[in-house]
């Protein structure tokens, strides 16, 4: 029995949800998001809420129940508030600069790294060591953050690299003489 799946997803005012075909589409002040529906789950759009129930009592349906409810919640949160991830750059000479739909990274390579920002994502650099990634699709925001971080993951000796805000970097002691 899913404790998460039991709760209905509340739809705030200004947000509309509709099921058409095999898609659930949610429209709000920040935009429109859609997701394909699972055959193992029953979705019901009522007044002010979306409820998610397993279609049958199979193990797979019960396993998907809580996850599908959370995906629906992420759609509603995305079109109302949006999602943000913050990356921090540590290291001498490491910096970032957002220029329109392009992010220029200087990460200690012999060349600058140019990252093309996908549609639906907004990137800001409040200072040259902080990158703010925001958008309405939680999966896409996380994917873009992971792709940027992949260029220079934090190393365990000095902690140089790109890390998520709040991420703990396991540090190692250097060689002893």
Swiss-Prot record:
Entry-linked PROSITE patterns: RIBOSOMAL_L6_1 (PS00525)
A GO biological process held by the record: cytoplasmic translation
A GO term for molecular function: rRNA binding
This protein's UniProt keywords: Ribonucleoprotein, Ribosomal protein, RNA-binding, rRNA-binding
Gene3D superfamilies: Ribosomal protein L6, alpha-beta domain (3.90.930.12)
Keyword RNA-binding: yes
GO CC, alphabetical: cytosolic large ribosomal subunit
Keyword Metal-binding applies: no
Family according to the record: Belongs to the universal ribosomal protein uL6 family.
Subunit structure: Part of the 50S ribosomal subunit.
Function: This protein binds to the 23S rRNA, and is important in its secondary structure. It is located near the subunit interface in the base of the L7/L12 stalk, and near the tRNA binding site of the peptidyltransferase center.
Protein's recorded name: Large ribosomal subunit protein uL6
Lineage: Bacteria, Pseudomonadati, Pseudomonadota, Alphaproteobacteria, Sphingomonadales
């Amino acid at each position: 029995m899913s404790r998460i799946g039991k709760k209905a997803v509340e739809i705030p005012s200004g947000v509309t949800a509709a099921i058409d075909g095999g898609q659930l589409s949610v429209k709000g002040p920040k935009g429109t998001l859609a997701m394909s529906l699972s055959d193992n789950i029953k979705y019901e759009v009522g007044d002010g809420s979306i409820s998610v129930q397993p279609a049958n009592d199979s193990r797979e349906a019960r396993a998907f129940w809580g996850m599908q409810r959370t995906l629906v919640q992420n759609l509603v949160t995305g079109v109302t508030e949006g999602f943000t991830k913050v990356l921090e750059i540590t290291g001498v000479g490491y910096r970032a600069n957002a220029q329109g739909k392009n992010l220029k990274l200087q990460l200690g390579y012999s060349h600058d790294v140019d990252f093309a920002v996908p549609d639906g994502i907004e990137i800001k650099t409040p200072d040259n060591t902080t990158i703010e990634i925001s958008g309405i699709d939680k999966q896409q925001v996380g994917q873009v953050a992971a792709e940027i971080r992949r260029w220079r993951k934090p190393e365990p000796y000095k902690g140089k690299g790109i890390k998520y805000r709040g991420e703990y970097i396991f540090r190692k002691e250097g060689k002893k003489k």
